[in-house]
């Protein structure tokens, strides 16, 4: 049976609540046969199913499923080791499955219940009336694990439909408002028209359709200024053979067609002129759509060679009669190696009609991309503009103050390893003598006034302060009654001198400047030292912690002998000031105080206090910009 529990091991058994399951087939296993000798009720009194009891029997073993324990704790406790559905790979138990037991009744005992009709309620949206209760649970309906859940309801038969006129379905618009309903319109039925009776019976041929005329658009007035350009007629196409030849007795071209003027225009507008005929195009294939005309009446003439120079190089063609004994004969104008011909064709200079052993003097000089010979002298500029300096913009200057052009600088002595160019001082200007000013304190923020040049003719010096004199007063500088130079506002000792010298203009070629830079020695040799007689005691602690200088290695400094060189200041050229930039110090480069004076900064060669000597006239071309 499809709804019962079919067993394919022996003969099929019937479902009967009064009878028992019996099997007497000889093919059944002895263990299973001894089990089936006993009566197994199909319906359990407590509601459990027959397959469940069959599975719980300790003497039945289905293939690879282990038997359940002998003494289970409860009949309703089903072991999870046994699945509800048996494995399908077993050929004998592939039809065993759980299902509901169908209750069989005698045909005489079947009682048909009366058809329950719904009461005619005026409101159709109400639920079912409350007097229709759910039917009682039947004991024959069971679940896989719990027989009290999901009971099946009996079939009460079809419900009689009410025969009422067709009305629109109404649904409430809102639950809070009154019983106002909005009708829902059903879609109208669209009838498909059948083919007319005189339609074509052949399915492969399409029915003839009536062509509808397109919308007629109004014609625009023709514009005489923008008339379309008409192509030349096909009769004027010369074709591949060129234009038609002239008559044999004619020696000149036929006269062109006269241009016929248009009608007289009274509005002053230039009349339209007939477009000129397009020039004959040579080298074009004839139009295949054009009808060929007979040209038997035209005598054959040879085209004359043009008198002008040819537009491209033409090689003479050598024609030789072919013979049976000359299969490998080639004309002399063609080389045997095809790769050697690619040079002249691609424009190689050595293969354009010139032999390889041709001397250089005999070759045709090339006019384009000619490089100057090394024997030719370099063109030097005849004159350069006078020495000028870039304007000084404080707080906006992004480059050091350098003369423009660089030729206005004094002669170059040497180049230091840090990228500074040191210039030698010009001769002929000696410093002037002046009274020694009183000493000044270092932390004084006021700028000292400009003073004349002090005496520097005795080769003074800056001796290294002794180790025992480092405890001197920090705010004073001791000096003998000799010449004393005033101190700048900078805590580092510096001597500022002002020198006036006659006008001296120096111009130098940039090429010569580069050659001089390359040939200069790196260390200074046989150079004098500028010294002063003042003995100074530098403070141990700097007045400002931000102005402290770390001990660094002293660079090469230009030191010129006194009495031979001096600093030149030109009044006519309005030179602003030369800076000696030292970007290793935290304070940055020194700033100019006088726009029209040279400033000479000197430092003591002492390295015990961490002070780095400066160059008297050094210009750093690669220094960082001044952004203060």
Swiss-Prot record:
It comes from Turnip yellow mosaic virus (isolate Australia). This is 69 kDa protein. Residues 166-178, 295-305, 586-596 have a biased composition (Polar residues). Residues 1-24, 141-492, 537-628 are annotated as: Disordered. It comes from the Viruses. Residues 433-451 have a biased composition (Pro residues). Belongs to the tymoviridae protein p69 family. Keywords: Host-virus interaction, Inhibition of host innate immune response by virus, Suppressor of RNA silencing, Viral immunoevasion. The keyword Ribonucleoprotein does not apply. One of its GO terms (biological process) is symbiont-mediated suppression of host innate immune response. Acts as a suppressor of RNA-mediated gene silencing, also known as post-transcriptional gene silencing (PTGS), a mechanism of plant viral defense that limits the accumulation of viral RNAs.
């Amino acid at each position: 049976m499809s709804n019962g529990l079919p067993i394919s091991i022996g003969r099929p058994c019937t479902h009967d609540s009064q009878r028992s399951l019996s099997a007497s087939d000889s093919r059944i296993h002895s263990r299973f046969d001894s089990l089936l000798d006993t009566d197994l009720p199909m319906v359990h009194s407590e509601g459990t199913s027959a397959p469940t009891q069959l599975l719980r029997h300790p003497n039945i073993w289905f293939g690879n499923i282990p038997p359940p324990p002998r003494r289970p704790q409860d009949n309703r406790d089903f072991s999870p080791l046994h699945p509800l559905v048996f494995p399908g790979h077993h050929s004998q138990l592939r039809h065993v499955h759980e299902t509901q037991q169908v209750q069989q009744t005698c045909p005489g005992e079947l009682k048909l219940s009366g058809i329950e009709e719904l009461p005619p309620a005026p409101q159709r949206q109400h639920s079912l009336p409350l007097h229709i209760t759910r039917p009682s649970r039947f004991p024959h309906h069971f679940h896989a694990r719990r027989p009290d859940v999901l009971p099946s309801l009996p079939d009460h038969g079809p419900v009689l439909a009410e025969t009422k006129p067709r009305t629109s379905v109404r649904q409430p618009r809102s639950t809070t408002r009154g019983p106002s309903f909005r009708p829902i319109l059903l879609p109208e039925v669209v009838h498909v028209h059948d083919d007319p009776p005189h339609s074509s019976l052949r399915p492969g041929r399409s029915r003839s359709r009536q062509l509808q005329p397109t919308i007629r658009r109004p014609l625009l007035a023709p514009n005489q200024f923008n008339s379309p350009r008409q192509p030349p007629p096909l009769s004027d196409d010369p074709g591949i053979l060129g234009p038609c030849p002239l008559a044999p007795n004619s020696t000149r071209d036929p006269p062109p067609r006269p241009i016929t003027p248009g009608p007289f225009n009274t509005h002053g507008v230039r009349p339209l002129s007939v477009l000129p005929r397009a020039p004959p195009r040579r080298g074009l294939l004839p139009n295949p759509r054009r009808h060929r005309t007979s040209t038997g009446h035209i005598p054959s003439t040879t085209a004359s060679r043009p008198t002008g120079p040819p537009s491209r190089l033409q090689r003479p063609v050598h024609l030789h009669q072919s013979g049976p004994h000359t299969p490998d004969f080639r004309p002399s104008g063609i080389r045997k190696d095809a790769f050697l011909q690619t040079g002249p064709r691609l424009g190689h200079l050595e293969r354009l009609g010139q032999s390889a052993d041709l001397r250089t003097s005999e070759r045709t000089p090339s006019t384009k991309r000619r490089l100057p010979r090394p024997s030719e002298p370099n063109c030097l500029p005849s004159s350069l503009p006078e020495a000028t300096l870039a304007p000084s913009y404080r707080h906006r200057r992004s480059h050091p103050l350098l003369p423009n052009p660089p030729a206005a600088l004094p002669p170059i002595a040497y180049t230091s390893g840090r990228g500074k160019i040191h210039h030698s001082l010009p001769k002929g200007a000696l410093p002037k003598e002046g009274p020694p000013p009183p000493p000044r304190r270092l932390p004084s923020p006021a700028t000292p006034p400009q003073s004349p040049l002090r005496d520097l003719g005795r080769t003074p010096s800056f001796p290294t302060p002794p180790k025992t004199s480092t405890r001197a007063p920090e705010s004073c500088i001791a000096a003998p009654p000799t010449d004393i130079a005033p101190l700048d506002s900078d805590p580092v000792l510096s001597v500022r001198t002002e020198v006036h010298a006659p006008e001296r203009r120096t111009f130098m070629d940039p090429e010569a400047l580069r050659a001089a830079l390359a040939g200069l020695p790196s260390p200074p040799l046989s150079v004098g030292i500028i010294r002063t007689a003042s003995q100074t005691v530098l403070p141990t602690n700097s007045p400002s912690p931000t102005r402290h200088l770390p001990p660094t290695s002293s660079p090469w400094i230009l030191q010129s002998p006194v009495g031979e060189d001096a600093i030149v200041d030109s009044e006519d050229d309005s030179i602003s000031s030369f800076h000696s930039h030292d970007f290793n110090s935290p304070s940055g480069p020194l700033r100019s105080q006088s726009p029209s004076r040279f400033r000479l900064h000197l430092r003591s060669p002492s390295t015990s206090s961490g002070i780095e000597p400066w160059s008297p006239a050094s210009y750093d071309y690669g220094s960082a910009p001044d952004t203060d």
